[in-house]
């Protein structure tokens, strides 16, 4: 931000709604809690974050490939189109529950696959879901730094890893 005032527009059905929003925005500006409304999706955020993260932390080619695959196949098909600012902890908990019922290989390179009945029975491991959580936690911490959101929308507790799976 250059320090210059920036303008934006919001529409409301009634004058009362507009006045209430104005009061809220002015209060948030005074508190320092105002976020500029942003339409960035989870998918857009993750594809901005991966190159930064991978360069900053010198990811190996394997880590890079696995992270991109996780985003393409496990995150984007389910919550990728959601706006970062609209995502809540409840949405992430629902997403984890969906992943727990998702067959391995449901998506390959982001494309939904036709699976056999046998393949449909082999579900994602709790380890995979935990890895998704770890990736999202790091990515959303950047979203906080980038002033897209105030807090990370992930559940306080990470999904449990079931040791008996192995």
Describe these PLM feature segments:
Residues 1-39:
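Short, surface-exposed polybasic/aromatic micro-patch for ligand or macromolecular engagement
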Residues 36-144, 153-159:
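Short, Lys/Arg-enriched alpha-helical recognition elements, typified by the DNA-recognition helix
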Residues 159-166:
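Short, intrinsically disordered, charge-balanced linker/junction segments flanking boundaries
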């Amino acid at each position: 931000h250059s320090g210059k005032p920036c303008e934006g527009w919001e529409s409301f059905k009634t004058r009362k709604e507009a006045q209430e929003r104005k009061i809220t925005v002015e209060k948030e500006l005074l508190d320092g809690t105002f976020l500029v409304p942003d339409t960035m999706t989870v998918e857009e955020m993750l594809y901005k974050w991966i190159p930064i993260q991978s360069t900053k932390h010198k990811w190996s080619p394997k880590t890079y490939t696995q992270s991109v695959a996780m985003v393409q196949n496990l995150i984007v098909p389910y919550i990728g189109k959601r706006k970062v600012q609209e995502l809540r902890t409840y949405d992430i908990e629902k997403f984890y529950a969906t992943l727990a019922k998702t067959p391995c290989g449901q998506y390959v390179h982001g494309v939904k696959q036709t699976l056999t009945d046998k393949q449909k029975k082999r579900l994602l491991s709790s380890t995979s879901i935990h890895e998704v959580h770890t990736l999202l936690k790091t990515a959303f911490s950047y979203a906080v730094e980038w002033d897209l959101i105030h807090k990370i929308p992930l559940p306080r507790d990470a999904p449990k890893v079931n040791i008996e799976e192995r």
